[in-house]
Amino acid sequence: MAESRQTRLQVKCPTCQTAVVWKPENAFRPFCSQRCKLIDLGGWADEEYTVTAQEEGLLEISEPDGAYR
């Protein structure tokens, strides 16, 4: 009964754009299926996707005073 009062959140599968109800029972969310999930994983493995980051200051590591050498 609580579910009927709440609006079901629907999202589009990132791979095939099929509408998917966002709920804990969907083990593949936000994907619609294991197949779409694996297609996306393959895209990351093939470096089809990237995550941009600020490179400024990322590699600046200072050694503490008296560090062993």
UniProtKB/Swiss-Prot annotation:
Signal peptide: none annotated. Zn(2+) binds at residues 13, 16, 32, 36. It comes from the Bacteria. One of its GO terms (molecular function) is DNA topoisomerase type II (double strand cut, ATP-hydrolyzing) inhibitor activity. Its cofactor is Zn(2+). InterPro entries: DNA_gyrase_inhibitor_YacG (IPR005584), Znf_NHR/GATA (IPR013088). GO terms for biological process: regulation of DNA-templated transcription. Keywords: Metal-binding, Zinc. Binds 1 zinc ion. Transmembrane segments: none annotated. Pfam families: YacG. Disulfide bonds: none annotated. Belongs to the DNA gyrase inhibitor YacG family. Interacts with GyrB. Inhibits all the catalytic activities of DNA gyrase by preventing its interaction with DNA. Acts by binding directly to the C-terminal domain of GyrB, which probably disrupts DNA binding by the gyrase. This is DNA gyrase inhibitor YacG. It comes from Neisseria meningitidis serogroup C (strain 053442).
